[in-house]
């Protein structure tokens, strides 16, 4: 789980650079992410379980996974016109409750006295996340981004749900291994977006930028593979990945001496306390 956080933090910083400095749009970023990650995954696939059952469930998993990834990037582009990436990650705190409830419903986690404490720590982490989000002080037009925001949250939650549903370690039912379904989903995305992006022209005009973004997807491969493993074991742990990335980015901001309010610092500390408390219980 910590490895996922480290890898995705690197990718978050590189994506920010790609948008701010290289001026890549959502389609270009999604294509580079999908194509480069799928290509790099070829080196890992021979060592993966590569479970594939010829059934509608396997193809459904691939299509649904491709859809969630496409929605994630497309909707994020709309939402980020009104709020920062930092604030968007804070909103993912809502999925913590949904994910742990899913673990309880599926039998991955047992309902008991510890569940009360876990929900309390989830609530604590969520409070910290929203404090961080509000620390920016910018007025956000939620009427404009309400539907995209809901769709984005459902896409992030749905990705983990797809993995746990089509390859459940608890029940022993697995139609397609998470890594293999992700690989086919990324290939599908790359093929669909290629006509819009014009890859050859892109690499000719922005060679260094496109190569930089592509190479930074090496940690993305490691992160995605490990994320899939986490999602098959626990939806709650999967949901905690993004808040942990938020906390890491928060500390990076402190190290770089970026402007930071008291509300921001307090939110970071509270969020960390919630994450640690959840893992301990």
Task: Show which residues each predicted segment covers.
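Glycine-/small-residue-enriched transmembrane alpha-helix faces in small-molecule transporters
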Residues: 1-24, 117-123, 139-175, 222, ...
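Loop-to-transmembrane-helix transition segments
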Residues: 1-4, 32, 42-45, 50-75, ...
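Transmembrane alpha-helices of multi-pass small-molecule transport proteins
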Residues: 3-14, 21-71, 121-127, 176-199, ...
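Hydrophobic/small/kink-forming positions within alpha-helical transmembrane segments
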Residues: 9, 13, 66, 70-74, ...
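Structural motif at transmembrane-helix junctions in multi-pass transporters
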Residues: 21-27, 75-91, 108-111, 168-175, ...
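Hydrophobic transmembrane alpha-helices of multi-pass small-molecule transport proteins
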Residues: 34, 38-41, 93-104, 114-135, ...
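Membrane-interface helix-cap regions at the ends of transmembrane helices
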Residues: 37-55, 104-110, 127-139, 165, ...
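C-terminal transmembrane-helix exit sites in multi-pass transporters
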Residues: 76-79, 95-117, 229, 247-266
């Amino acid at each position: 789980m910590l490895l996922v956080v480290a890898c995705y933090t690197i990718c978050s910083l590189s994506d920010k650079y790609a948008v701010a400095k290289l001026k890549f749009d959502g389609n270009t970023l999604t294509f580079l992410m999908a194509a480069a990650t799928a290509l790099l995954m070829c080196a890992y696939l021979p060592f993966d379980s590569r479970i594939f059952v010829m059934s509608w469930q396997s193809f459904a998993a691939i299509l649904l996974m491709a859809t969630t990834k496409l929605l994630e990037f497309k909707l994020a582009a709309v939402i980020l016109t009104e709020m920062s990436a930092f604030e968007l990650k804070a909103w993912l705190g809502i999925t913590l409750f949904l994910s742990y409830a899913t673990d309880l419903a599926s039998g991955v986690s047992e309902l008991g006295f510890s569940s009360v404490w876990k929900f309390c720590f989830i609530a604590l982490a969520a409070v910290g996340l929203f404090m961080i989000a509000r620390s920016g002080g910018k007025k956000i037009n939620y009427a404009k981004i309400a539907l995209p925001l809901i769709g984005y949250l459902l896409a992030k939650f749905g990705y983990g749900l797809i993995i746990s549903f089509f390859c459940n370690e608890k029940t022993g039912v697995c139609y397609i291994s998470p890594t293999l379904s992700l690989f086919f989903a990324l290939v599908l995305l790359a093929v669909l977006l290629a006509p819009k992006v014009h890859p050859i022209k892109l690499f000719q005009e922005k060679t260094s930028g496109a190569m930089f973004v592509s190479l930074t997807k090496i940690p993305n491969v490691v992160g995605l593979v490990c994320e899939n493993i986490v999602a098959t074991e626990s939806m709650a742990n999967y949901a905690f990945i993004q808040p942990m990335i938020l906390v890491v980015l928060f500390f990076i901001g402190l190290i770089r001496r970026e402007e930071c309010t008291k509300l921001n610092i307090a939110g970071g500390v509270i969020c960390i306390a919630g994450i640690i408390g959840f893992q301990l219980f």
